[in-house]
Amino acid sequence: MAAPAPRAGRRWWPVGLGVAALVAWSWHGTRVELGALLSGAALAQIAAYLGRLFPPDLSAVALRNAALGAWETFAISLVGSGLACLIALPLAVGASATVLYRGVLYERRRPGPLAGLLRRALGLASKTVLAVCRTVPEIVWALIFVFVVGLGPLPGVLALGVHTGGVLGKLFAEVLDDVDRAPIEALQATGAGRLAIVLYGFLPQALPQFVSYALYRWEVNIRAAAVMGFVGAGGLGQRLYVALNLFHEHELLTLIAAVYVMVTLVDALSAWLRARLV
């Protein structure tokens, strides 16, 4: 009984060696030199810059600026996450093979050849849209929307909505494909149509996981919203960019502290909501 274990271990050796070789090759290719970072001159420069950050700027103007930026970033992340859910849900239904063209819904009555082809085409189109949305990073979407609609919070909201919509759509589709078939069969036994089965059989089972994924992505988006401000998408990131360019180090530390406080509070709020809703 114990004989297969060594063979399994031996199978992993080539994979482990290959990964190690790839990491070593990548390290060499990027020409990373930790010695330069840990040299006396570099450490002295880091210490000097950190010294210029303190003390933080606690003036009324700086605190108001940080509070407004934090509120704007919070709003961007929340509205962007809500937009993402609106984008993800219909595309997830279209991308779910179990809902659209195969599985328990179609064991008793299969769609005709033309209807089946159209359903598969719709599924492919939905998956393609989701793939495009999620493979382009948020900051690239933000740059695109800055050029389209101008500076401010709107491009940040649109960027988060599009990218996160693609991520959530893929996750939602996988959840729909893995629902328990027993409630579906019970609804079929009552003569319910496919739309009713999707609404009352699929979605109630999937909803807790939908909420969990959406809350997790909101936690990710609050960080992304802060970064997107560096390309003009509003929020704390835009204020951080200005403070860096103007060498306002004391205000910069205040803004960094605001980012930390905001992210910590959102993480705690998301965990509290997940514990009560999921």
What are these model-derived regions, one by one?
Residues 212-215, 253-278:
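C-terminal transmembrane helix and the adjacent membrane-cytosol boundary/short C-terminal tail
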Residues 147, 160, 219, 224-259, ...:
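Glycine-rich helix-loop "coupling/hinge" segments at transmembrane-helix boundaries
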Residues 110-159:
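Generic hydrophobic transmembrane alpha-helix motif, especially the helices
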Residues 89-97, 171-178, 182, 221, ...:
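Membrane-spanning helices that line or support transport/gating and their immediate boundary helices
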Residues 144-202, 208-217, 268:
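Membrane-cytosol interface at the C-terminal ends of specific transmembrane alpha-helices
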Residues 67-75, 123-133, 215, 219, ...:
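Alpha-helical membrane-interface segments at transmembrane helix boundaries
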Residues 1-82, 86-90, 94-124:
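N-terminal, non-cleaved signal-anchor transmembrane helix
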Residues 81-89, 93, 97, 139, ...:
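Hydrophobic positions within alpha-helical transmembrane segments of bacterial inner-membrane proteins
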